[in-house]
Amino acid sequence: MKIQLDMYQTIAVAVVVLMLGKFLKERVELLERFCIPAPVIGGVIFAIFTCLCYVTGIAEFSFDDILKEVCMVFFFTSVGFQANLKVLKSGGRALIVFLGLVITLILCQNFLAIGLAKLLHISPLVGLCTGSIPMIGGNGTAGAFGPVLEDFGVKGASTLCTAAATFGLIAGSVMGGPVGKRLIEKKNLLDTVVVEDDSLLIEDERKHERHASMYPAAVFQLIIAIGIGTIISKLLSLTGMTFPIYIGAMIAAACMRNIGEYSGKFTIYMGEINDIGGISLSLFLGIAMITLKLWQLADLALPLITLLAGQTILMFLYTYFVVFNVMGRDYDAAVLSSGVCGFGMGATPNAMANMQAVCEKYAPSVKAFLLVPLVGSLFADFLNSLAITFFINFL
């Protein structure tokens, strides 16, 4: 029996899953203690349910996830509104260092995948199906490069890449919170938290205020930025390079924020925009999690499971020892480490959810919430595509 849910039913199920995750997180100490995001908790439970239904032949669920993209764009547009020139300048060196760490991670993931593939006596191109294509790249890059690998003779590469990306989405989400928690508590990093002043944040005194009458204006500002962003995205596509769909909206939002900030002609309602962005992130993750097809992981052969285990171990070691130490060994570095687990094995929204869960438990981290979406959204996909192209042609 095939059960098809339209976009309204899909987002309704996602909301129920979010509520379930929040309910369990509030009552299960282990989930709260390890900072597991609520959408992941409820989503994994639902994904296991749909997997059992599929395996036993009871039912196969089909979702219309078109609203997932809408929620993703709204969230990243809200992130774009947080960017301004002064903050970007203040994080200049940290931005370069963090970008270097991401580039190194891309290379490590691919070298590990190729090395393990040779040890297991399988094609290095099969190994690449579990490298940075699905890890840093996520499902989008997996879908783009799977057919390319098939053209190079890797049978079922699209399925393998998608399955690996599915695994990474779960592993990165589950790992991020515990990594951040362990670093913070083991090294007593709350003592290193510095409350940033207004001159660094470039926020007015009403940043943390919320006014019901201003939410419509905030929604309108988001919609305008998204509309302008579609034009920017079309212009970027003329370069022949592939960018995430939300990049144009992020750029438009950043421009609107800076024009408003420096001209004083209009106000950007950051408090309300942040709230709307948070809701959009939760809905995006909810839909992404319920549409996971866990049975794809069961179809992986033992060598591929070994490859994925290797990527998981690499991610833990890299974030815990390398990212944390290079980024300063402080609270911000710990939050960044939890974020890298998210977009290093899945997607930037998962990174944001990991960091959000950690910061809700401990303290805010302006630095982490600036660097991760900036590098993860603007640079990682582009650099990853270049690296993947090199590795495919080199092999």
Task: Put a short name on every predicted segment.
Residues 17-18, 169-262:
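Membrane-embedded hairpin module used as a gating/binding unit in multi-pass transport
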Residues 24-40, 57, 61, 230-251, ...:
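Flexible hinge motifs at transmembrane-helix junctions and intramembrane kinks/re-entrant loops
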